[in-house]
Amino acid sequence: MKVLVIGNGGREHALAWKAAQSPLVETVFVAPGNAGTALEPALQNVAIGVTDIPALLDFAQNEKIDLTIVGPEAPLVKGVVDTFRAAGLKIFGPTAGAAQLEGSKAFTKDFLARHKIPTAEYQNFTEVEPALAYLREKGAPIVIKADGLAAGKGVIVAMTLEEAEAAVHDMLAGNAFGDAGHRIVIEEFLDGEEASFIVMVDGEHVLPMATSQDHKRVGDKDTGPNTGGMGAYSPAPVVTDDVHQRTMERIIWPTVKGMAAEGNTYTGFLYAGLMIDKQGNPKVIEFNCRFGDPETQPIMLRMKSDLVELCLAACESKLDEKTSEWDERASLGVVMAAGGYPGDYRTGDVIHGLPLEEVAGGKVFHAGTKLADDEQVVTNGGRVLCVTALGHTVAEAQKRAYALMTDIHWDDCFCRKDIGWRAIEREQN
C-alpha cells in the first residue's frame, strides 16, 4: 500500500521513517518533506505545501494513496481531514471541529470547564484594560497565552507583574502573534513537573503511546524563552502507573467522551500537555491535536508496533483490537538549532558531519533542512536536527545522543547540554 505523510519537520521524518518499516507498505510519500526524508531510501518527497489542501487531495487521488497521516497542526485546523474524508480517502487526524482543541486555547479552556476536567484557573480576554485589571487582582507568577496557533511559542510564563503586563500589551495591542493573539487566555501558574501524554483515538477507543517529557525553554536548566521544544526523552518517570491511570480517568476519557457528546468526535493523535503536582495529580496545561515535536522522535525510536497498522485500525474504529509494544530501553533526542532561535536565525548554512549510514540504536532526524542544488544538506529552519539514541537508562541514552552529534556541525549551531536532566536526577537518587 501507499502512505502519505503531511509535513516537513522532525516529527514527520520520524513518522514517515516508522511507517516505511511496515510490511504493509511499498511507498511512503512526504509532502513536502525535508533533506532527511529526501535521503531516506524508502521515502519520497512531494513538493506540496502542508496547507495546500486541494493539491494534497489531487495527489492522494492520482497516486491512489491508501492512508494519509497528518503531522502538523495547521492543515488539521484548515480541515484537511474533512476534505479527504469527503472524497472517500483514509486519513488519520481530527476534523477541523475537533482540532479546535489546539486551534483555540479559549475553546479548550471552556471545554475543560464544561466537562470538569482538571486545569488551571483562567479567564479569556480581547481587551487590554480588563486583562490588566485581572492581572493586578491575581498577581505574578501568571501565564499569558495567545489564543490561536503560534508554533508552540505563544505562551509567556511571567514571573513579574511587569512582564505579564508587557505580554498583554504585545499580544492584544502590539500584534506580537498576529491573528493568534487577538484573544488571550490568562491563567494561574501551576507548580509541578510537566509531561507529554500522547494517545491515539479512533472516536471511541483510546490507545496510549509511550510517555515523554519535552524541554520547552531554549537554555540549560530551563532558562530563556519558550521554543517549540529543544529535546525530549521517553518514558517519563514522573508518569508513574498511578499518574497514568489518573490521567486516563480524569483527562483523556472525559475529553474523548465530551468531544463526541458535543458533536466533534475525535480521531487522531491527542497530546495532553500535563502538569503533575507533588501528590501525583495531573492537570491539563494544553492540548495538541497531533504528535509532539520533538517527542515523536524518541517515541518512534522506541516503538516496536506497526504504526501503519495502528493508524488503519483507528480509521476503522478498531483500536480496541490493538495494543502497542515498546522497546524496554529509554530514548532521548537533542535538538540542534540555528543560532538566534527562537528569535531571528539564518538559513542556508551547509551541515557537515552527518552520519553516512544508519547508526545502531540511534538516528539523526531532520527538521529544518533541505537539499541544495549541489545536493549538500543545508539549514532551512530554527530547529534543524533531532539527534536521538536508545540506552538502558535515560543517562545512557543521553550520553549516546550527545556522542552521536560530536561530528555534526554548521556555522552558529547550538543545543542544550542537559536534555533529560530531571529523569537523570531521579535515576541517580
Swiss-Prot record:
Transmembrane region(s): none
Pfam families, per database record: GARS_A, GARS_C, GARS_N
Enzyme class: ligase
Biased composition (Basic and acidic residues): 213-223
Binding site for ATP: 135-196
EC number: 6.3.4.13
Cofactor note as given: Binds 1 Mg(2+) or Mn(2+) ion per subunit.
PROSITE patterns assigned to the protein according to its UniProt record, in alphabetical order: ATP_GRASP (PS50975), GARS (PS00184)
Binding site for Mg(2+): E286, N288
SMART domains: GARS_A, GARS_C
InterPro entries, per database record: ATP-grasp, ATP_grasp_subdomain_1, PreATP-grasp_dom_sf, PRibGlycinamid_synth_ATP-grasp, PRibGlycinamide_synth, PRibGlycinamide_synth_C-dom, PRibGlycinamide_synth_C_sf, PRibGlycinamide_synth_CS
Any one GO biological process: 'de novo' IMP biosynthetic process
Associated pathway: Purine metabolism; IMP biosynthesis via de novo pathway; N(1)-(5-phospho-D-ribosyl)glycinamide from 5-phospho-alpha-D-ribose 1-diphosphate: step 2/2
Reactions listed under catalytic activity: 5-phospho-beta-D-ribosylamine + glycine + ATP = N(1)-(5-phospho-beta-D-ribosyl)glycinamide + ADP + phosphate + H(+)
Segments forming domain ATP-grasp: 109-316
PANTHER family for this protein: PHOSPHORIBOSYLAMINE--GLYCINE LIGASE, PHOSPHORIBOSYLAMINE--GLYCINE LIGASE, CHLOROPLASTIC
NCBIfam families: purD (TIGR00877)
Subunit structure as annotated in this protein's UniProt entry: Monomer.
Family: Belongs to the GARS family.
Entry protein name: Phosphoribosylamine--glycine ligase
Origin species: Escherichia coli (strain K12)
